Amino acid sequence: MSTILEKISAIESEMARTQKNKATSAHLGLLKAKLAKLRRELISPKGGGGGTGEAGFEVAKTGDARVGFVGFPSVGKSTLLSNLAGVYSEVAAYEFTTLTTVPGCIKYKGAKIQLLDLPGIIEGAKDGKGRGRQVIAVARTCNLIFMVLDCLKPLGHKKLLEHELEGFGIRLNKKPPNIYYKRKDKGGINLNSMVPQSELDTDLVKTILSEYKIHNADITLRYDATSDDLIDVIEGNRIYIPCIYLLNKIDQISIEELDVIYKIPHCVPISAHHHWNFDDLLELMWEYLRLQRIYTKPKGQLPDYNSPVVLHNERTSIEDFCNKLHRSIAKEFKYALVWGSSVKHQPQKVGIEHVLNDEDVVQIVKKV
């Protein structure tokens, strides 16, 4: 472990010393690729044993979505969780109070949302310091990250936390790079650019790929990509998670400072202690989770509006709905009757591939 950390430290120092220009781009690209490989080793060391096995760290996934609270120690994560979900997570006015993952659950708009108060991340978590590695491993399983920041401390904390999460392959509020990449057995490196590139050229791409011992591949760049984007695609283990920045303790700042905070993208100012602005926070959480509620309607009965079937936005077909209820239903499926905004007629007969909208009502008709 220490040798990996030493190598990472040496590469980061060299990158900091190297001036960024066209002449050094290939060298920097190579260093970035080496750094990504070392970080992968750090995340998943060889010769498993299934993790550290420390008590309280991984929590069984329950509910329709999982939200992780990430932040430096003593920024108010535990207070926020207790006030949102009524869960007691040990709170004190000194750092490192929460030492295990504390789960809570809230019901919002019919969906059950699991909330995880993760132990405070300290600087250097991605390098194995503190319990940061286990914390970030749990953060990777979340559908949404709440990054809790103390608005009395500068936004430098935000940059540090983003840097820690980036080091573990978590990309916040980003989409996967629009790059086509396929390895092949022969034919060398074939690079196609659909738009002019400001950083990547054939030589730099070959340099990065050679670090991964890849000498035959087809690559299509569909936008002006960076070497970091290409490395993310090659690594293939990146997680893209939406993030909301919660600037806590707004009861201790002026109105003018609050106006500045409101201009920060993906940001909600709150006071966990005084329950201020929780409505805005929950509404934004719902928007970022992109969940869809589908109501069931048994034959001859009224729809059940109390317990919706909750689907994730990218998986909202009738087949996904059937599988969420029970896997056997899709096999016995004949057709479905749908009421709602996804159909022209009320009701409309649809097949298993029909895509549903939020708050549609569905009645399944099985084969006889």
Swiss-Prot record:
Q: Does the keyword GTP-binding apply?
A: yes
| Any GO CC annotation of this UniProt entry | cytoplasm
Q: Which CDD domains match?
A: DRG, TGS_DRG1
(3S)-3-hydroxylysine sites (modified residues): 22
| Residue ranges constituting the OBG-type G domain according to the UniProt record | 65-290
PROSITE patterns of this UniProt entry? G_OBG, GTP1_OBG, TGS
* One GO biological process term: cytoplasmic translation
Decide whether keyword Nucleotide-binding is in the record.
yes
Protein name, entry field? Guanylate binding protein 128up
**Ligand binding (GTP):** 71-78, 117-121, 248-251
Instruction: State the family named in the UniProt similarity comment for this chain.
Output: Belongs to the TRAFAC class OBG-HflX-like GTPase superfamily. OBG GTPase family.
What's the stated role of this polypeptide?
A: Catalyzes the conversion of GTP to GDP through hydrolysis of the gamma-phosphate bond in GTP. Dfd/deformed is required to activate 128up in maxillary segment cells.
Q: Which InterPro entries match?
A: Beta-grasp_dom_sf (IPR012675), DRG (IPR045001), G_OBG (IPR031167), GTP-bd (IPR006073), GTP-binding_2 (IPR031662), GTP1-OBG_CS (IPR006074), P-loop_NTPase (IPR027417), Small_GTP-bd (IPR005225)
The record's tissue-specificity note reads: Expressed in posterior-lateral epidermis of the maxillary lobe.
- Domain of life, source organism: Eukaryota
A molecular function annotated in GO for this UniProt entry is: GTPase activity
Q: Which residues form the TGS domain?
A: 290-366
Keyword annotations for this protein, in alphabetical order, are: GTP-binding, Hydroxylation, Nucleotide-binding
